[in-house]
Amino acid sequence: MITTVFVRAVLLGGLLAGVFVLSAMAEGFLFRSTIVGSNPNTVIGGVPSGGAPWTVQRGSAALNDDGRLRVEVRDLILPKLGNPGPVTNVSASLVCGGSGGTVVATTDPVPLSADGNAEIEAGIKLPDTCFGPIVLVRAAGFNGNLLPQAGPWIAATGFTSSSEHDDKDDKDRK
């Protein structure tokens, strides 16, 4: 009896994992990346970064082929304060053309929690072609007041050399 229940549980788990993988593949992702905090004096797509460094404990951005953009940040903070300071809302912008490119779409603002957590899920109009895509997380509200348009970027898609990675199988690294 216990063996039958165990076998069924394993089979159900495998089936659910397969369904998840197939649904993720069906999503048609055009772009997925981690998100890192900004440093001052950096311009991407004509948008300046904030005046102080920001950090992100965990963040990701994904854009699928029907224009659905999903951005999630956890602990997006000003390290000197340990919180997001006066920033209470954020939006996301898609830049095409790399750091020298242009902003082609920006989402509506969403709340940024006092812990620096936010989730953006929005449909954006995609251009026919987008080389070197970058997603910017931008300050969009201060002290509860929304800006008329998105402000400086405080995080963006990318990686840092200190990002955790598993290089057990990477024989070229030493």
PLM features per residue range, with description:
Residues 83-90:
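Short coil-to-beta strand junction motifs in C2/discoidin
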Residues 101-165, 172-174:
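Helix-rich interaction surfaces within compact, conserved domain-sized segments
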Residues 20-26:
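Sec/Tat signal peptide C-region and signal peptidase I cleavage site
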Residues 1-11:
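Bacterial N-terminal signal peptides that target proteins for export
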